[in-house]
């Protein structure tokens, strides 16, 4: 399978409707943004004829086709999984892309429904939310930590989360992930190598280091539910960016979701007072 991507050089508003039309003919397609350079909008996972797609998009001087790089994922199955998860999220949220129309309460409601459906034993749908919030919190200065925590606490007290019906069929990616695990083509840290992560030693916190060093023997390492949550969240962060949701709100979403399973405020307050990092679950799920 030879995938290509399309990078847009000009006004994305002109192409918005045409891009959405491609979802009907490109089963792996998803919308993304460059991570460096000009951060241009792009669509990836394209398999169709370039001339045919160009005719659909129109205004052919506003975009270019390039070959999809193959140096990030360990195998083609990982890339297809990546495409499928992004594609599912695009179909839910693309009406809000390149605009400022989405409500944060709706996104949090969606995340809560996803987390509840992914969780089957303990905290599979929530663990990565706490991990990402804690990684962010740990990078802040002492003053920033206190400031952000107080802002999040106040915002949390006032937020009214929307009841958002689950709009994604998670059975399909779960089945795919299970098959890939059984074939040794996927684990929790894919597409990265656990050995290389340990060797590099770039840990976000002591909790993160402890988790990484003991990962190979852990429950989450080859858990299809933990893996789906991690991959889905990484795709969701692209979706948030495309909806013009500020980065700080991304971490607030993590905070809100983590509060469902962990005493986040207590963990943060203890860290601020003692410098001790400790993660524990709420009693009702232990």
Where in the sequence are the language-model features?
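An acidic, charge-biased composition feature
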Residues: 1-286
